[in-house]
Amino acid sequence: MSEQAPIPFELKKLIDVAGDLELAVELRLHTIPMIGRLGSQEALVALLDIAGNQKATYRERDLALKTAREVLKVLASRRD
């Protein structure tokens, strides 16, 4: 079994903010594109986790899914 690389500190902080349901929705929505700009596989997984979170608002889930799609395009182009 391969070990997973540790999550970078910046990404961990952004994930914490995006997942904190006690924070304002607008703040959480602002964090999602920031996660996407990191453009890593870990960021993609984090975005998919947000998109799959039933407690997140529809807007958060939709934005996370759209952002994940963009990150996936970037990751796919790096492999070509």
Mark where each language-model region is.
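Alpha-helical repeat scaffolds
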Residues: 79-80
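Core helices of alpha-solenoid repeat scaffolds
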Residues: 7-11, 44
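Structural detector for internal amphipathic alpha-helices that build alpha-solenoid repeat scaffolds
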Residues: 1-7, 16, 26-40, 58-76
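Short inter-helical turns and helix N-cap capping residues of alpha-solenoid HEAT/ARM repeat scaffolds
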Residues: 22-24, 54-57
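Short, charge-rich amphipathic alpha-helical segments embedded
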Residues: 40-46
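Buried hydrophobic core positions in alpha-solenoid tandem helical repeats
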Residues: 13-15, 46-48
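Low-complexity, intrinsically disordered tandem-repeat tracts enriched in small residues
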Residues: 18, 50-51
